[in-house]
């Protein structure tokens, strides 16, 4: 209960006392007697007496009814602890408990008593031999022995004396004697016969190259047809294996859970809960970084006009300004006052005879002439008059300025070849390349525009919605009204400034002086025919009247079209001699000067009036630089093909040539080679120039930053309530800024997995993204064409006659003067900054810069996310003593503790019940001597007896009375664990203990929830230097890093190369000078230009062929020729490296359609193209075979349902069509059965990234519609969409339209090709964290199923919750050129640049001061029609109420035929027409050069069968052929495993098929037990490697992986043994590779047990030889062995450590010392049944005792023995 209901006890006590007090005061009645002893009288009633004393308490009343329940009283205090309850009844026997933990080892027991003697032992071993005894007596002599062996031959005896005997027989041949000395050389023998031809000797060394032979005769021939394709080669080896999967993370895998149940139905919505309490305000965030500079705001309203300032001091006179641009022509004024009489004009031509005049004064006499008539109306401007006669020659004018370069002359004669020049500069970048093929389809497009407005809903007001998130800033408002004119700026810089824009039209000047009479006007247009005069048959003609006044000058006519160039005029008469010049002496010719900077192009010179004759041919000029491509010439005759020369060395750069003529637009060329990066230029000086003329409309830029909201406008007038209706729902606001980071929510419960939805429709177009990074500056646009001139304005009012004007404008420029001297002037002042140049071609990457200085500390970052829990830290120092904590809740039952210290003696307990008699105890040790007892009574002394033997222990006596408590006993053995007692009272908090020893680190817990982002810590101390790590191997190429921070600004580079010539400057004003003196007659002039080429002469006779000339210089690139015919298709080249993506070229104009090329070889099936425009209908073709499936067309409008047709006759079966294109993506089918495991595919190569697509061509202009009626009719039906029209002039921004209705959902589009990576999108809203799913088992990748039928378009889905933020994508390729953005803000003024290096010679100097005013020039030609004026203000907005949609009106009358439209764009090429008639036979061409030898031709068609021949005579029998190859056999499924013992995959023996390859597994060890693999069986070749290729599972449906100390052992390679265990990618070089092959017969291993290689049995062939590997052991004496008949027992390579141990959980491998390999040894024949002699072999001699072996396969041609 709340504390408000508790009433304190001390408040109740006084109220009780008060009640008690009131009840005790009762009435007291006093009796007043009124009797008299005398008389009795009745007195009046007295007043009430005072109350009497309180009466005694009354008797106890009846028990009242129970009252209502009172308020609950206060909580009582805790009662004192009650006495312990009585002992409960003994409970039932419990079930057998879980076996307890083993107890601690007990203390050592006392030593036992000595045991009895043991049984007699076994007989001992024989003793050692005794010492030799004393020698005995000699025995008797023995028996005689056997005869001994014959003795050695004795010495030679003395010769006997006797007679000579008869000759003996011939003895045996003696031993061959020693070789004799060599004899002298003999004479030469006769020459022998010619011997047989000897064997071919070895090739000698390569001889020197021979001299070049004479050129051969030209061969005649043509390229032969392509040869047949060769036979299919043998199957290549299997490709490399796929990537090795990484070992999975440690963890415990829980068995599969059941399938989720069906999703329940959606429940009713619950009631709205109460509003929660307001949260506490969050912590104030750190101040944000300064934002970007905002857009310039809208102009504010004009302020009140300020006070007029005081007039300033007069400024100094400014510099003379440059000539401004020509102003716009003014409106023609009213005619001025009549001028003075002009010079008399030439007599006009005699006019036509007029009609007879009216009769004179009388009937027969002429009347007097009438007064002159009024001047006629202003005539229309007449046509231009004929050229006047040439005037007399004027005086020679002053020498003009040197003219600009003339038009390029005709090419001179070809000069002698110059010396080989140096390498030229890089050429001008070529025109953009040919438009590439359409790229891959891009990613899905952006969210589309909102659809049309839906049907108005019913206006039932809904509940008020929640406040939306604040929207983003709106787009910048419309342009405001023009502000007041700004303060006048400072005067411009006349020396260094650029010419400004044309100034505004000045006020009307004062009236000028009367001018001289003007030249006679142009003749007027003949007037209309006059009324017929009165007829007078007899009247004479009237006299000729006086000449009338000149009429008003006509209005200027519109500007005519530019005429064709006129014919050159006749030669004028020579002028008068000029004034004599100062006599000069011709100086010697100076040395040729360096090439000057290219001059600005001058004005076109006047046509010369001299008749030119071709001069003598000049010396050959130097070759100029390559000009721009000239106009496309006519197609020339084909020339003779020249001999292909060797490419020459690059020549030196020639001087700059004249600018070439602009070429015709052709197809854009390929991208040029990127140039070298230019050097950084110096910053220039100068003020910024005035804005240039407006260029053509650029493409829309990237969207600018959102502008600030405009100022709030004034409040509008209130709308009457009658017109208030709920408006249509507005568009969704822009998404608000992301709110502050919320508190971390609790993780939600995992939801059930819903069924897979149908594929959604394409989403709506997304909101515009944040502005991207600024793109590269585009190329400057081409200046726009001049707009159409407006109509002339109305004539102005007549001005008052003005005062004398200032001197007039200088006259027109004079004729082109003689060339001036060419001395180089002094360098001019620094030029103005040029326009921004085009972006250079990206340079080669620079060298890495020097290491920069350490940067300043950065701005503190935002608070980071909570990290994962760290590793256990080192134990900390003991903390200070803590405050005692509150008593905790009782803990769970703990395990039994060790025995405690002996307790203090307890109080004596009550006497217990008598126990059952115990078993007899073990006799105790002798006790210590007791205390002396009380002296007994003295007995009689007895005789001392002998000590008796120890008696048997007696039966236990009756239990005596309970004695006094003895001393505490020794500690007993630990008892069994008692049952859990009641929870005791919480103890008093103890003292804080000393800090314990730090415990062992616990196992890793689950990762915690993400914590609150912590503050940034301080930088740690630098660590100690680590041990050197193992030698690194080259890692794989990493992902591209994020772009680095921009580096510091580098030092200033040297000045750049001179720029390209600038644009043509404005025309300068002509200078004025004093007339020079007459010069002497000059030297003869330069030879004139060559004349025009004459008409072509008749064809001459063929001359004799000349000698081949020297190789000429490479000519200028010719204009692109007409497209040639398609050549034969080349052989496919090798796949090139991916090039860098080129810059997208400009879209070129469409080229002329090329000729139809020869049909190419049928290419591979291409990707599906976009559907083309329908062409015109061609002629009906012959019926073709069934074509390939076409692309799906756009869905048509549904047609009306037709009547059901009758069944047709069954058709013939058609030919089998080509497989169709893959259909649209179908609905997901039911889950299929698990497929068989497929073979792992070879990894594919990376595809080339697609090029960005080009901007598409403009479409065809739409057809003009019929003119509509101007009355606002009812709304008609929507027409069919027209073809897109040409771009119109940009209109004024229209009024904001009403939102459209939502459109129908479109059909699902065709699945696009994967697009290029887009620009990273804006950061999405943080999504709700999903519950981490359980890790599924890896399935075997199935084969891709067939695409299903396309699904129906699904309903439009609800917007999903924002997903979690994805990782930052790689930077995408540059996107397509964006639309031009809103104009950016002007940047801040940059720092002043460093002074630059001295510049190259500047342009010609500034214009000098003005000369004296010249004589007024002649009237100029009428100006061109002025530009149209600015758009007037918009008219008043008509108030138009939206009418109802009317019925469709009747068909209108056909309109008037419109004017002929502009010619349309070239159409798409139509279908090929029928072949034309064969043309006439052309002339014979020149014989061509011999072609390259053609490839082997295809075999010809078989010839016609010849005439049957006469049968020939029978031939001789041929020799018997070799035995044929064995017939086809079927593989019997024998498997052979080959281990390479290297990191290379072995090849199968010839004739065998490789089934798979992998890694050589020897055995595995789990739970301290090993399992061996026979290396000859396929199970020893695992296709994937892992240090832990298995996991183990127990009976609890739990499997554990990489959680124990299990191991795997693999055959290893010859890689050197590492010092430390290797891990991850470092393991691969140590694991042997293997291949499993299918053999045609059985395979065995034979062992020789010697160092000789054994032979295979008869009928068996050898596969490989090796060493006999028998057994192996590893950790814990576990291991295995090989069957000696298996090929796995014969390893090709011997090494003492043929395998490596890998620890599964750690993921490392190493050669440990307890690994042993066992090999068969060599056994000699005589050592078979002997005791082996121990022997130790050192490195280098190990193979001397290892048995050799051979693996054999049964020959397929051996017939099995059939008994």
From Swiss-Prot:
Q: How is it modified after translation?
A: Prolines at the third position of the tripeptide repeating unit (G-X-Y) are hydroxylated in some or all of the chains. Type IV collagens contain numerous cysteine residues which are involved in inter- and intramolecular disulfide bonding. 12 of these, located in the NC1 domain, are conserved in all known type IV collagens.
Single GO cellular component term: collagen trimer
Q: Where does this protein reside within or beyond the cell?
A: Secreted, Extracellular space, Extracellular matrix, Basement membrane
Triple-helical region: region residues = 43-1529
Q: Residue spans with biased composition (Gly residues)? A: 400-409
Residues covered by region (Disordered): 51-529, 550-1529
Which parts form a coiled-coil structure per UniProt?
Answer: none
Quaternary structure (record): Trimers of two alpha 1(IV) and one alpha 2(IV) chain. Type IV collagen forms a mesh-like network linked through intermolecular interactions between 7S domains and between NC1 domains.
Task: From the Swiss-Prot or TrEMBL record, give the protein name.
Answer: Collagen alpha-2(IV) chain
Organism encoding this protein = Ascaris suum
């Amino acid at each position: 209960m709340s504390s408000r209901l508790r009433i304190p006890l001390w408040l109740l006590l006084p109220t009780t006392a008060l009640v008690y007090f009131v009840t005790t005061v009762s009435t007291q009645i006093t009796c007043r007697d009124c009797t008299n002893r005398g008389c009795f009288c009745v007195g009046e009633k007295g007043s009430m007496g005072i109350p009497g004393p309180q009466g005694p308490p009354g008797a106890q009343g009846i028990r009242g009814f129970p009252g209502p329940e009172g308020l609950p009283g206060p909580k009582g205090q805790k009662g004192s602890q009650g006495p312990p309850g009585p002992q409960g009844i003994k409970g039932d026997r419990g079930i057998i408990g879980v076996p307890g933990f083993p107890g601690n080892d007990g203390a050592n027991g006392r030593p036992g008593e000595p045991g009895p003697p043991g049984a007699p032992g076994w007989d001992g071993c024989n003793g050692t031999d005794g010492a030799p005894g004393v020698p005995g007596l000699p025995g008797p002599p023995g028996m005689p022995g056997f005869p001994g062996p014959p003795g050695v031959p004795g010495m030679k005896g003395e010769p006997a004396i006797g007679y000579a005997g008869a000759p003996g027989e011939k003895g045996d041949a003696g031993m061959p004697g020693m070789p004799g000395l060599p004899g002298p050389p003999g004479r030469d023998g006769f020459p022998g016969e010619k011997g047989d031809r000897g064997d071919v000797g070895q090739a000698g060394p390569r001889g020197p190259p021979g001299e070049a032979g004479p050129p051969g005769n030209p061969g005649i021939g043509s390229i032969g047809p392509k040869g047949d394709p060769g036979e299919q080669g043998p199957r290549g080896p299997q490709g490399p294996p796929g990537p090795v999967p990484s070992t999975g993370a440690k963890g415990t895998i829980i068995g599969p859970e059941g399938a989720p149940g069906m999703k329940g139905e959606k429940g009713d919505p619950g009631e709205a809960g109460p509003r929660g309490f307001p949260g506490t305000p969050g912590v104030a965030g750190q101040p944000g970084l300064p934002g970007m500079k905002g857009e310039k705001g809208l102009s504010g309203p004009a302020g009140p006009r300020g006070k007029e300032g005081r007039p300033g001091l007069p400024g100094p006179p400014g510099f003379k300004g440059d000539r401004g641009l020509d102003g716009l022509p003014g409106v023609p004024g009213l005619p001025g006052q009549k001028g003075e009489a002009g010079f008399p004009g030439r007599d006009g031509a005699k006019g036509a005879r007029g009609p007879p005049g009216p009769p004179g004064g009388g009937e027969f006499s002429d009347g007097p002439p009438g007064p002159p008539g009024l001047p006629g109306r202003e005539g229309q401007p007449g046509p231009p008059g004929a050229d006047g006669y040439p005037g007399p020659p004027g005086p020679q004018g002053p020498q003009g300025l040197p003219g600009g370069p003339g038009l390029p002359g005709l090419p001179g004669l070809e000069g002698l070849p110059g010396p080989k020049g140096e390498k030229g500069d890089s050429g001008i970048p070529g025109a953009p390349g040919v438009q590439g093929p359409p790229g891959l389809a891009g990613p899905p497009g952006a969210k589309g525009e909102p659809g049309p407005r839906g049907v108005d809903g019913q206006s039932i007001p809904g509940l008020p919605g929640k406040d939306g998130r604040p929207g983003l800033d709106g787009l910048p408002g419309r342009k405001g009204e023009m502000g007041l004119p700004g303060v006048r700026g400072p005067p411009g810089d006349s020396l260094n400034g650029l010419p400004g824009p044309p100034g505004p039209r000045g006020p009307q000047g004062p009236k000028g002086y009367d001018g001289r009479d003007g030249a006679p006007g142009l003749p007027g247009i003949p007037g209309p025919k006059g009324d017929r005069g009165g007829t007078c048959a007899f009247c004479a003609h009237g006299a000729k009247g006086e000449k009338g006044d000149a009429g008003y000058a006509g209005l200027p006519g519109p500007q005519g079209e530019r005429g064709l160039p006129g014919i050159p005029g006749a030669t004028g008469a020579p002028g008068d001699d000029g004034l004599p010049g100062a006599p000069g002496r011709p100086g010697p010719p100076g040395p040729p000067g360096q090439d000057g900077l290219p001059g600005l192009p001058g004005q076109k010179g006047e046509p010369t009036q001299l008749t030119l004759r071709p001069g003598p041919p000049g010396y050959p000029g130097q070759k100029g630089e390559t000009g721009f491509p000239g106009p496309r010439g006519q197609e020339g005759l084909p020339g003779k093909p020249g001999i292909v020369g060797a490419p020459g060395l690059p020549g030196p750069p020639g001087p700059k040539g004249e600018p070439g003529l602009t070429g015709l637009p052709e197809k854009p060329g390929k991208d040029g080679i990127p140039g070298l990066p230019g050097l950084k230029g110096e910053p220039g000086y100068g003020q910024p120039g005035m804005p240039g003329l407006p260029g053509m409309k650029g493409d829309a830029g990237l969207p600018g930053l959102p502008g600030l909201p405009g100022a709030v406008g004034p409040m509008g007038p209130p709308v009457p309530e009658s017109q208030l209706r709920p408006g249509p729902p507005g568009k969704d606001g822009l998404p608000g800024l992301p709110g502050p980071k919320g508190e971390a929510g609790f993780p939600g419960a995992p939801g059930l997995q819903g069924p897979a939805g149908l594929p959604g429709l394409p989403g709506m177009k997304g909101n515009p993204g944040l502005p991207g990074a600024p793109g590269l500056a585009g190329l400057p646009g081409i200046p726009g064409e001049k707009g159409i001139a407006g109509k002339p304005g109305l004539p102005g009012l007549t001005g008052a006659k003005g005062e004398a004007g200032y001197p007039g404008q200088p006259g027109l420029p004079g004729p082109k003067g003689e060339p001036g001297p060419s001395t180089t002037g002094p360098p001019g002042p620094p030029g103005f900054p040029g326009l921004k140049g085009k972006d250079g071609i990206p340079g080669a990457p620079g060298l890495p810069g020097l290491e920069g200085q350490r940067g300043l500390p950065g701005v503190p970052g935002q608070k980071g996310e909570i990290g994962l829990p760290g590793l256990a830290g080192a134990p900390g120092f003991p903390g200070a003593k803590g405050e005692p904590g509150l008593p905790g809740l009782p803990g769970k039952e703990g395990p039994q503790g060790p025995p405690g210290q002996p307790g203090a003696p307890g109080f004596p307990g009550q006497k217990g019940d008598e126990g059952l008699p115990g078993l007899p105890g073990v006799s105790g040790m002798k006790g210590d001597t007791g205390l002396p007892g009380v002296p007994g009574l003295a007995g009689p002394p007895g005789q001392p007896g002998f000590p008796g033997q120890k008696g048997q222990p007696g039966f236990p006596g009756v239990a005596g009375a309970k004695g006094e408590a003895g001393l505490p006993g020794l500690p007993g053995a630990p008892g069994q664990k008692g049952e859990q007692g009641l929870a005791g009272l919480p103890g008093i908090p103890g003292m804080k203990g000393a800090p314990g020893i730090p415990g062992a680190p616990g196992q890793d817990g689950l990762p915690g929830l993400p914590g609150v982002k912590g503050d940034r810590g301080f930088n740690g101390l630098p660590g100690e230097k680590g041990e050197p790590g193992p030698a690194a191997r080259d890692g794989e190429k990493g992902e591209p890093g994020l772009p680095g921070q921009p580096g510091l600004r580098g030092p200033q580079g040297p000045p750049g190369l001179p720029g390209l010539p600038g644009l043509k400057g404005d025309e300068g004003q002509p200078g004025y000078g004093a007339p020079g003196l007459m010069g002497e007659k000059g030297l003869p002039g330069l030879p004139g230009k060559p004349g025009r080429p004459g008409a072509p002469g008749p064809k001459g006779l063929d001359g004799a062929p000349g000698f081949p000339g020297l190789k000429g210089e490479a000519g200028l690139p010719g204009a692109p020729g007409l497209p040639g015919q398609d050549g034969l298709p080349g052989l496919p080249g090798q796949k090139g490296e991916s090039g860098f993506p080129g810059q997208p070229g400009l879209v070129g104009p469409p080229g002329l359609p090329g000729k139809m090329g020869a049909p190419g070889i049928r290419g591979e099936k291409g990707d599906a193209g976009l559907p083309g425009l329908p062409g015109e209908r061609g002629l009906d073709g012959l019926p073709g075979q069934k074509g390939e499936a076409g692309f799906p067309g756009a869905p048509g409008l549904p047609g009306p349902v037709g009547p059901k047709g009758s069944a047709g006759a069954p058709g013939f079966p058609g030919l089998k069509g080509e497989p169709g294109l893959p259909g649209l993506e179908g609905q997901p089918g039911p889950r299929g059965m698990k497929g068989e495991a497929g073979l792992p595919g070879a990894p594919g190569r990376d595809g080339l990234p697609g090029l960005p697509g080009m901007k598409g061509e403009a479409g065809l202009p739409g057809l003009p519609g019929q003119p509509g009626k101007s009355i606002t009719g009812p709304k008609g039906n929507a027409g069919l969409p027209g073809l897109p029209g040409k771009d119109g002039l940009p209109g004024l921004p229209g009024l904001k339209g009403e939102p459209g209705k939502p459109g129908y959902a479109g059909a699902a589009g065709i699945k696009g090709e994967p697009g290029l990576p887009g620009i990273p999108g804006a950061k999405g809203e943080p999504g709700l964290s999903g519950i981490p799913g359980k890790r599924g088992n890896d399935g075997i990748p199935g084969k891709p199923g067939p695409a299903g039928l396309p699904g129906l378009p699904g309903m439009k889905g609800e917007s999903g919750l924002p997903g979690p933020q994805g990782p930052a994508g790689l930077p995408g390729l540059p996107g397509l050129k964006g639309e031009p953005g809103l104009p950016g803000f002007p940047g801040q003024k940059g720092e002043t640049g460093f002074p630059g290096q001295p510049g190259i010679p500047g342009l010609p100097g500034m214009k000098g001061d003005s000369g004296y005013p010249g004589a007024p020039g002649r009237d100029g030609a009428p100006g061109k029609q002025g530009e149209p004026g600015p758009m007037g203000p918009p008219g008043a907005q008509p108030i138009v109420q939206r009418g109802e949609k009317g019925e469709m009106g009747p068909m209108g009358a056909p309109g008037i035929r419109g004017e002929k439209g502009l010619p349309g764009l070239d159409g798409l090429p139509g279908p090929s027409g029928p072949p034309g008639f064969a043309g006439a036979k052309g002339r014979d061409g020149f014989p061509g050069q011999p072609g390259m030898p053609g490839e082997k031709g295809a075999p010809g068609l078989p010839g016609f069968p010849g005439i049957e021949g006469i049968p020939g005579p029978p031939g001789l029998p041929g020799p018997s052929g070799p035995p044929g190859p064995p017939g086809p056999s079927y593989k019997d499924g024998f498997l052979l495993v080959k281990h390479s013992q290297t990191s290379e995959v072995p090849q199968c023996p010839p004739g065998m098929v490789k089934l798979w390859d992998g890694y050589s597994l020897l055995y595995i060890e789990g739970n301290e037990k090993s399992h061996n693999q026979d290396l000859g069986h396929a199970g020893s070749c695992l296709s994937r490697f892992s240090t832990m290729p298995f996991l183990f599972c127990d009976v609890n449906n739990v499997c554990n992986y990489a959680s124990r100390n299990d191991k795997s052992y693999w055959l290893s390679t010859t890689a050197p043994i590492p010092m430390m265990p290797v891990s991850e990618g470092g393991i691969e070089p140590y694991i042997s590779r293997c291949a499993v092959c299918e053999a045609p017969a059985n395979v065995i291993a034979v062992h020789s047990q010697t160092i000789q290689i054994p032979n295979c049995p008869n009928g068996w062939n050898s596969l490989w030889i090796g060493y006999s590997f028998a057994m192996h052991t590893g950790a814990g004496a576990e291991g295995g062995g090989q069957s000696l008949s298996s090929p796995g027992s014969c390893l090709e390579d011997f090494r003492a450590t043929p395998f490596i141990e890998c620890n599964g959980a750690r993921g490392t491998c190493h050669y440990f010392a307890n690994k042993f390999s066992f090999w068969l040894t060599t056994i000699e024949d005589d050592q078979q049944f002997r005791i082996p002699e121990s022997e130790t072999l050192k490195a280098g001699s190990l193979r001397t005792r290892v048995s050799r072996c051979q693996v054999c396969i049964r020959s397929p041609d051996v017939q099995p023995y059939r008994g």
